Amino acid sequence: RKQELVEAFEENLDFFIETSQVVRSDINLINMEIVKNYFHKKGIVINSSNEKFLMRSAGISYTDKDTGEEKCTLGGLLVFSDNNSLCIPQNMIRITNNLGKGKDRVNVVQGNLLSMIDKSEDILRKILPKNYPIGAIVEAINNAVLYREYSSIDRVIEVVISRNSTIVNSPGQMIQNNSTGKRINYNRRNMWLYEKLVTLDENKRFLNNEGGFGRIKKPFKKNVTFINSRAEDCFKVILPGTKLYEGKK
């Protein structure tokens, strides 16, 4: 399977799916303010003379061998582009509101990864009761954004809100064993993304990411279900719905 091949390359060949080349991309899609902020936080001065070198070295861009043009990597688009959906439409969070409150039933969130998390939180605050533990859903979205399988080009992160449950569905299962039977830590996926997000995130949402599952369960007294589906090749977080919080202050 494609995902297993990607996992094998990442494990044995020091290959990151995030640094794979996006042939039909344009370097002008990169938001240079985010790039400058990233290098500034690393203590590196970026200017016109070293810009291309630093971006290539960091895996944000590459030089097309045939045309000599600068183009974007997958990770470069995910982290540093506000309009990456033009090249990677799978980078999307779809929030479905089944509460029937007259608000937009489906909200589509796109952009660079950190902005997508912020936009999703804003949408959730408009949909959910004020006393609902929104932070738990945002934590699940954080994990989905960081660890989803970005090589799944026909699937997106889905958040479905109803009175009975709230579901966060992320493409790519939590692989525990590779094709040879060797155990793999879920947190090893997308390490390139992790480094970039940790560096850029002013809210420090990813610094203590290993405790994410605990932070998701705690507000609901552990009444949360995690489903790692090999058949569907996805990871689901199922939280309580809104009915327990309706009418409460």
Where are these regions (language model features)?
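Flexible, glycine-/charge-rich segments associated with ATP-binding catalytic modules
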Residues: 28-31, 86, 176-249
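Active-site helix-to-loop segments that bind/position phosphate- or nucleotide-bearing substrates
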Residues: 1-152, 157-166, 174-179, 183-188, ...
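Conserved DxG motif in ATP/Mg2+-binding regions
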Residues: 166-171, 239
